[in-house]
Amino acid sequence: MKFEAIAVEKIPLIHEGDNLPSIICEKIGLQDRDIMIIASTIVAKAEGEIFRLEDITPGEEALEIAARTGKDPRFIQAVLSKSREVFVETPFMLVTTLAGHTCVNAGIDESNIENGFLLYPPENPDASALKIGKELEKLSGKKLSIIITDTNGRAFKIGQTGVAIGIYNIKPVKRWIGEKDLFGKVLEITEQAIADELAGAANLLMGEGAGGIPVVIIRGLDYYCEGDTSIKESYRPENMDVIKQGLRCLRNKK
């Protein structure tokens, strides 16, 4: 068994209004059940999620956090505008975004963007993946899966890895519960983070900085799944998320 990870090279700089599916199809031929891994940065650029700090007016909460942390209140306001809950204020802001993804600084990106500008993540990554996927399928005539990715740090390790923040035609988690292991024991809790693993694999080719590749095809693995899918299926239910519960306890003690 094997699979390929194929970098889609020579993707041009993306601007607001660009047709990503058309651009991708011009650069590479697609096959049935290809899994398209697309960096959130180019999706956000095409959707016009670019802003400047000088256009941000901080509110009362942003000013209060700035007074406590010494951060730029305009940047804090930008983070708050995309967040439903703040867990940590410094040395970085750890938040859950409006889309439900928990990450640093609401996923706002200061890299791979023109000087003086910053980039919000896609407002609804699942909806973005669906739109891109349907158009790619229409243009190519192939059945495709889409994963929109971002890079995240890990709580207990150094370094970032690719993670899925939006999906189309793929389940984010494979549940092995009820299957048997090598010794015939029934698995009770094993759940494999398929979408995140694929995002991490693609990130080896995507890289970071000036040499980044924003689109990678995973070919040879069949995780195609028609019907409604959402990255939210991979988020822990609130009553099971002990890390968030612990962060809330620490926050409320201050």
From Swiss-Prot:
Catalytic reaction equation(s): oxidized coenzyme F420-0 + GTP + L-glutamate = oxidized coenzyme F420-1 + GDP + phosphate + H(+); oxidized coenzyme F420-1 + GTP + L-glutamate = oxidized coenzyme F420-2 + GDP + phosphate + H(+)
NCBIfam families with a match to the protein in the record: F420_cofE, PRK13293.1
One Pfam family in the UniProt entry: F420_ligase
Top enzyme class: ligase
Biological classification of the source: Archaea, Methanobacteriati, Methanobacteriota, Stenosarchaea group, Methanomicrobia
Assembly with partners or alone: Homodimer.
EC id: 6.3.2.31, 6.3.2.34
Cofactor: Mg(2+); Mn(2+); K(+)
GO biological process: F420-0 metabolic process
Pathway, per record: Cofactor biosynthesis; coenzyme F420 biosynthesis
The protein's name: Coenzyme F420:L-glutamate ligase
Species the sequence originates in: Methanosarcina mazei (strain ATCC BAA-159 / DSM 3647 / Goe1 / Go1 / JCM 11833 / OCM 88) (Methanosarcina frisia)
Residues that bind GTP: 11-14, 40-41, 45, 112, 206-213
